[in-house]
Amino acid sequence: RGLGDVYKRQPHTISEILQQSSHIQTIAKKYSHFEEYFFLGRQYMFPVSLEAALKFKEITYINGVAYPAGEMKHGPLALVDTNTIVIALCGNNHTYDKMISNIMEVVARKAHVLLIAPTGKSSYPPVQDQFLLPIYPFDELAIFPYSVVMQLFAYYIALDRGCDIDKPRHLAKSVTVE
């Protein structure tokens, strides 16, 4: 498939994700009591992890921190233990195996891991939970469905924690002062 075909399929893919929102809600309920989240991604998935961490801060009031997965060994790995939730965003490209290696590092430290990955891989790491997305031949466009999954995850955690999703505290809809 060409880039244009994949782009045109985006609404259908997002609709499929929304139909699976109860699965995302079930996972969110398991993790809503944790207070620290790490979001890991490589290449195009790193900006998605940044957006997910921001969304967590905005609507769940939980500290979410995004890291490029390859940087975990340079400090953040020291913070990982049984009280850590790691959201691993795996793209469908040459970084997949490296990402799995990063995931195994946090699994070895007994962190709770939610894997967001493409379907059809020959193997997945032994993690507590996973949400699989359709394979995208272009990771540049995979950022959209991955972002929807992360927004739903934050939404359901905020709901479970009793946060006012429609009026997040201290959040302005636009910047009005400099």
Enumerate the predicted regions with their spans.
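A short, well-structured juxtamembrane/interface segment
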Residues: 17-33
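Glycine-rich, anion-gripping cofactor-binding loops and their flanking helix/strand elements
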Residues: 73-105, 137-151, 159
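Short, small-residue-biased leader/transition segments that mark boundaries at the very start
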Residues: 2-7
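A short, charged, Gly/Pro-tolerant segment at domain boundaries
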Residues: 8, 165-178
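Anionic-ligand anchoring segments at beta-strand to alpha-helix junctions in alpha/beta enzyme folds, i.e.
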Residues: 30-81, 112-113, 121, 152-155, ...
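Structural beta-sheet core signal
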Residues: 39, 86-88, 115
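Active-site regions of enzymes building and remodeling cell-envelope glycoconjugates
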Residues: 124-137
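Short, charged/polar "capping" segments at the starts of alpha-helices
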Residues: 95-97, 120-124
